[in-house]
Amino acid sequence: MKAMAENTRIGVFGWGIVAPRSPDVAVFEKNLGRATSWLEPFAGFGPSNFLVGRPEFDFGFYKPWIDERFEPRRFSQLNSKMGNTVKYAIGAFIQCLEKNPGIESLLRDLGAQAHVYVGTGLGDFPLQYELVLRYHRAQKKWNQFWCRDEHHSELRSYRVATARDRKRICDDLGAPPDPAGIDPDVEDLDETVERWNAFWVLRSDGLHRYLERSREVEGEGVTGDIDNGKGLLIRRKISSRKKLNAEYGCPTEPWNAVDPNLLWNIPNIPAAQISMLGRITGPTIAPIAACAGFSVSLKMAIDAIRSGQARICVIGMTDPEPHALSVGAFFGARVLSHDGRVSKPFTGMRGTHVSGGACIWIVGDAEYLMGKGFEPLGLEILSVGVSSDADHIITPSEEGPRLAIRQALAEAGIEPEDVATWDMHATATPGDWTELQNTLAVLPGSMAITARKGTFGHGMSVCGGWELTAQHLGFSKGALLPVNLEGNEVHQQIRPYYRRLVQDEARPTEGDVAGKINMGVGGINACAICRRW
């Protein structure tokens, strides 16, 4: 082996998991000991043939931890304002702290030398969907109200005009079709009414008078003492708005129907909440790299630690539970299985399964942390190589992944023949064949290969964390945990290599080096190289 370019050794000193059928790492490891699938039918469209990985999670389990450290209302605030994507990350982070007692205090005491790099692949689709629907319903009611005759003189005149004049008015204004002239059996009447009201509400004289009154209410600023005055002003404005709306009898304004929880759940909030709950004051950033996200966050930590900017980092990814939007989007991209059966890598290439959950690690300068009595988990982290295909948004290239692998090996000082096991991204699509060819072009064919999306599905960004944790859990103890795969299922074109694929029985291993690659939507690749301590 070549000497590493940097001397700082990096270890894992805490990890937490939220995954299908796995609320924590202990259950995750136990489940991995059996070659089964953790997928279940998806009910988001009503009956369908989709299988998904639904995370097993109860945020209430973490209430005692939060109550012990914060004011009594903190848990209820988090529970009501945070979506599950944030909650999964919080739960996994709290799990991390249990692995090495005392590390929580160190994260706080290190100040700017403790970093947080936790991102997401999709954002909180389920929460966004519900809140957008709420706004949309409010906007429809609002438009309909201000298009009534008593609030819209122009539309009132239009309605009593002759058919010829109505056509002329619509043509002159460029108005959408009048729903009064639509056959509901031929066209969607609801959408026609919605487009009609959305056009005419802009010309409502009643609404313009209302907005003039509203400007008077909203135009008042803070006077006198700012700290005392701001609260009084907010309450006074709320009261004045209620009186104004009662006077007009109007529904809730659409801007008042937009829930601020949309803002409290933007992509950097999982990292931000970890920072606040852990009182970690160093840089807190949300890396976004789709399916390669976990190893990209690990790469950021490695770089920060080896450059001397950080001693310890919280890293990871979190994804929402499967939702109609995520399942439908993956299906529309033609990468999702929809036949009611588990689709396994290297078999029928029928597509993958959407999953959600979180994986959070605490990584750091191993000598520094072990010197303080903390014990490393799993494997030593040697390197992460990152590259981009700069080609297709979803179909992997040859050069991009190979470049990431070569970078990681070079940075780790590892020769290809030193790699004993390799975990693949493998989404049970035709891309599995390309990925296998890329792997074998750089690495020797004697290594043992794992691919686990047939077990727990594909979390958009968290999948790499689950897969890397599974590799660490087994390989650090001298074995590769079984995979939900049988030899007779392997695709004919891949069958010449099937003996290298870890299948439904654990496999003892020789050697010390493990590798892992993930390839993300957009063409980003991340390859991690690790070694037994």
Model features per residue range: what roles?
Residues 1-78, 120, 129, 133-186, ...:
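ACP-dependent fatty acid/polyketide chain-elongation machinery
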Residues 9-13, 30, 36-42, 338-414, ...:
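Condensing-enzyme catalytic core mediating Claisen C-C bond formation in acyl metabolism
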Residues 43, 309-333, 337-350, 384-396, ...:
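Acyl-CoA/ACP chain-elongation machinery
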Residues 73-91, 153-155, 199-202, 210, ...:
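Active-site pocket-shaping loop/turn-to-helix segments
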Residues 89-103, 267-271, 278, 284-318, ...:
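Active-site-proximal alpha-helical scaffold in enzymes
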Residues 96-114, 277-278, 369-374, 404-421, ...:
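Phosphate/pyrophosphate-binding loops at sites that engage ATP/ADP/AMP, CoA/4′-phosphopantetheine
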Residues 123-282, 327, 332, 431-444:
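Active-site-proximal gating segment of KS-fold condensing enzymes and close homologs
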Residues 148-151, 248, 252, 299, ...:
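Glycine-/small-residue-rich "gating" segment that lines the acyl/pantetheine channel
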